[in-house]
């Protein structure tokens, strides 16, 4: 079957490589393939789609550059399903951010607008799973020494990642993870001193409490205040970094 014959409608005329990429993406979706799953070899795809190697390779490149697959080298290598952690989406986004001249200040403002929405949705989730997941992440972070800057930053980032994941909104969660990942590229240059880290821990506790109590308004407020605190700290101490244009990575 040639890639253009699938029953799903296509929004425009596509190159063969784009049709192949779209079909492979449908396969991943339909078969519920998980990250790391091996995809068919190049020769098998050429035979299936009745196309040459160039079209298949271009299709794989389209998927790879968007973080949807990765290419393993060596024995047993080939295309595998990529991770859904948001880094691929984030990398693609930085191309657009750089082209429009968006700064890290713009990115921080976007996080401040987006994450409170996710917190409110997390608190609105039925049952106890959202609160339990956040509580577990919080407890892990409390064991990290405040004097270890890199580990503290990593545990702080992990807490926010859990908050996104329990929101019940996969699209906004993906966007938030992407913005967080773009920001984390500069995390070694933007470190909270030990004195301010206590406030971060306290904020995370208040956020967790609000989600556990299913208090959406309070969860939203706490996350907004938490990020505004961090943004103000960056404005006071690292304004030059916030003025930097986001670069493709």
Protein language model regions, located:
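Conserved amphipathic alpha-helical segments that form helical-bundle/coiled-coil interaction surfaces
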Residues: 107-189, 200-208, 218-233
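C-terminal effector-binding regulatory domain of bacterial HTH transcription factors
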Residues: 2-7, 217-249
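Short linear motifs at protein or domain termini
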Residues: 1-113, 120, 124, 241-242, ...
């Amino acid at each position: 079957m040639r890639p253009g014959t699938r029953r799903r409608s296509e929004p425009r005329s596509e190159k063969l490589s784009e049709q192949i990429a779209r079909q492979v993406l449908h396969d991943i979706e339909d078969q519920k393939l998980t990250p790391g799953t091996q995809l068919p070899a190049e020769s098998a795809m050429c035979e299936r789609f009745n196309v040459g190697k160039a079209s298949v390779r271009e299709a794989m490149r389209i998927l790879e550059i968007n973080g949807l697959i990765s290419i393993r080298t060596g024995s047993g290598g080939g295309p595998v399903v990529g991770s859904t952690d948001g880094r691929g989406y984030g990398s693609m986004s930085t191309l657009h951010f750089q082209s429009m001249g968006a700064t890290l200040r713009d990115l921080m403002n976007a996080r401040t607008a987006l994450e409170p929405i996710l917190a409110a949705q997390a608190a609105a989730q039925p049952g106890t799973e959202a609160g339990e997941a956040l509580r577990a992440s919080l407890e892990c972070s409390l064991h990290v020494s405040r004097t270890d800057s890199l580990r503290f930053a990593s545990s702080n980032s992990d807490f926010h990642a859990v908050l996104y994941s329990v929101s019940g909104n996969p699209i906004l969660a993906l966007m938030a993870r992407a913005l967080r990942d773009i920001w984390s590229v500069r995390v070694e240059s933007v470190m909270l001193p030990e004195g301010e880290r206590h406030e971060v821990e306290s904020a995370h506790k208040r956020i967790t409490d609000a989600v556990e109590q299913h208090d959406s308004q309070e969860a939203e407020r706490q996350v907004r205040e938490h990020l505004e605190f961090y943004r103000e700290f960056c404005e006071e101490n690292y304004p030059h970094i916030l003025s930097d244009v986001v670069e493709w990575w």
